[in-house]
Amino acid sequence: MKLPIFIADAFTTKAFRGNPAAVCLLENKLDEDLHQKIAKEMNLSETAFIRKLHPNDNFTQSSCFGLRWFTPQNEVPLCGHATLASAAVLFHKIKNVHSTLTFVTMSGELKARKEEDGIVLDLPLYPAHPQKLHEVEDLIKTAIGDTLVQDVRYSPDTKKLLVRLSDTYNRSFLESLTVNTENLLQVETTGKVKGLILTLKGEPGGQTQAFDFYSRYFAPWYGVAEDPVTGSAHTVLSSYWSEQLGKKDLHAFQCSNRGGELTISLRSDGRVDIKGGAALVLEGTLTA
């Protein structure tokens, strides 16, 4: 078996920042168990597998492909950064002739559009509903201790818990927070929560430029302690912060060690466009 494989850093234009994803191009059907084995071998938060949908398709001329995402532990229903990385490989390395690509996924059809300053992902927008604090208080205290919380929301579609920190905190505070993700696994065992979003209102002008909000994302339930930059989390964050700020166009920064920024536009059809850059950092062949 020889498979073309790439690593691209998503939601950045600089190598070694943003969120790295492995991208595998599948010329032929792959044994089901090999998807997970390859993802575990790559040991990144996600490995994406792009497959041809019809025998006569090819990666240069076709515009519609199948796409699946795997963490080192299991398959996930949606991954924004690995979708961006997949589109970047097809657009910039394979030189696909189309300006818009369609990916058939567990979350429906997702489109990626090439623009001069990045790639725009057309993603579903997920509402986050008010969450009773007492039901998740142990989880929140385990994650952030006595840190002041301003709002708690829950997205049943994505099983993500959104915790907004008090507006009295700033970006530096969010960046410095230590979250013991192993303890989260011991506290939340019901399956209700599969991802924890910590978020904070942006500061006017920010530290170097204006961001509407900041976030960090933790998903130990999927084998990912902290994800560097998370497109799927922003399908929830976009809905929340648009409502809070009364804006349809947002600029966001995810405050992981690697960091990454996202340009967001909520659409009238109930979906969201999320734009980011990508840097291709590795190209090779997987042999087994």
From Swiss-Prot:
UniProt keywords, alphabetically: Isomerase
Top-rank taxon: Eukaryota
Molecular-function GO terms, alphabetical: identical protein binding; isomerase activity
Record EC number: 5.1.-.-
GO CC, any one term: cytoplasm
SUPFAM superfamilies (UniProt xref): Diaminopimelate epimerase-like
GO BP, sorted A to Z: biosynthetic process; maintenance of gastrointestinal epithelium; negative regulation of transforming growth factor beta receptor signaling pathway
List of catalytic residues: E46
Family: Belongs to the PhzF family.
Subunit and interaction comment: Interacts with UNRIP/MAWD.
UniProt-recorded name of the protein: Phenazine biosynthesis-like domain-containing protein
Organism in which the protein naturally occurs: Bos taurus (Bovine)
Gene: PBLD
